Curated annotation (Swiss-Prot):
Family to which the UniProt record says this protein belongs: Belongs to the glutaminase PdxT/SNO family.
Organism: Bacillus cereus (strain AH187)
GO molecular function: glutaminase activity; pyridoxal 5'-phosphate synthase (glutamine hydrolysing) activity
One BP term from GO: pyridoxal phosphate biosynthetic process
Pathway assigned to this chain's UniProt record: Cofactor biosynthesis; pyridoxal 5'-phosphate biosynthesis
Entries under NCBIfam families matching the protein: PLP_synth_Pdx2 (TIGR03800)
The keyword Hydrolase is assigned to this record: yes
The protein's assembly and partners: In the presence of PdxS, forms a dodecamer of heterodimers. Only shows activity in the heterodimer.
Lineage: Bacteria, Bacillati, Bacillota, Bacilli, Bacillales
GO CC terms in record: cytosol; glutaminase complex
Protein name: Pyridoxal 5'-phosphate synthase subunit PdxT
Function: Catalyzes the hydrolysis of glutamine to glutamate and ammonia as part of the biosynthesis of pyridoxal 5'-phosphate. The resulting ammonia molecule is channeled to the active site of PdxS.
């Protein structure tokens, strides 16, 4: 069984844990840097990205997270987690973890009152996934090596680049665990490759 960490500094941590467990993997709430060595994949939950960055800096997680990404272990960022994974952020000089060749705009779908749900077709997941968008970012631009898994209107809302997965929406806030199960499969595949 693969062990998937959920960064436990802020956001919908409990909901991600429940979704990971429902997808047949072991979930670990990561609150200490040394826990990164014990896991096969990591979820960066949604929340408020500037608050998340402050907490990451306060607890000295940034370099260990970048090292985790460089090791090739899978990472899945939802909402604010997508912002953390992006190499380029509109209106900001520097990236956070910067593992994905994507350009992201924060709060691109509007403020809290503009939050909404939408039926999404997600490549490798299904045609009828309900995406929950809360002050959601979206992907403005991708490099050629990034696969677009889903769009809402003309906006890219789910992308994959090798071991990295990012979504504008909150899959953990529904009872549909297919997106988390997709990530669990990514983690299993990556772990199998390491063993071979």
């Amino acid at each position: 069984m693969v062990k998937i960490g959920v960064l436990g500094l802020q956001g919908a941590v409990r909901e991600h844990v429940k979704s990971v467990e429902a997808s047949g993997a072991e979930a670990v709430v990561v609150k200490r840097i040394e826990q990164l060595e014990e896991i096969d994949g990591l979820i960066l939950p949604g929340g408020e990205s500037t608050t998340m960055r402050r907490l990451i800096d306060k607890y000295a997680f940034m370099e260990p997270l970048r090292t985790f990404a460089k090791s090739g272990k899978p990472m899945f960022g939802t909402c604010a987690g997508m912002i953390l994974l992006a190499k380029t952020l509109i209106g900001y000089d520097e990236a956070h973890i910067g593992a994905m060749d994507i350009t992201v705009e924060r709060n691109a779908f509007g403020r809290q009152k503009d939050s909404f749900e939408a039926a999404l077709s997600i490549k490798g997941v299904g045609e009828d996934f309900v995406g929950v968008f809360i002050r959601a970012p979206y992907v403005v631009n991708v490099a050629d090596n990034v696969e677009v898994l889903s769009t809402h209107g003309d906006r890219m809302v789910a992308v994959r680049q090798g071991p990295f997965l990012a979504a504008s929406f909150h899959p953990e806030l529904t009872d549909d665990h297919r997106v988390t199960a997709y990530f669990v499969e990514m983690v299993k595949e990556a772990k199998m490759k390491k063993v071979v």
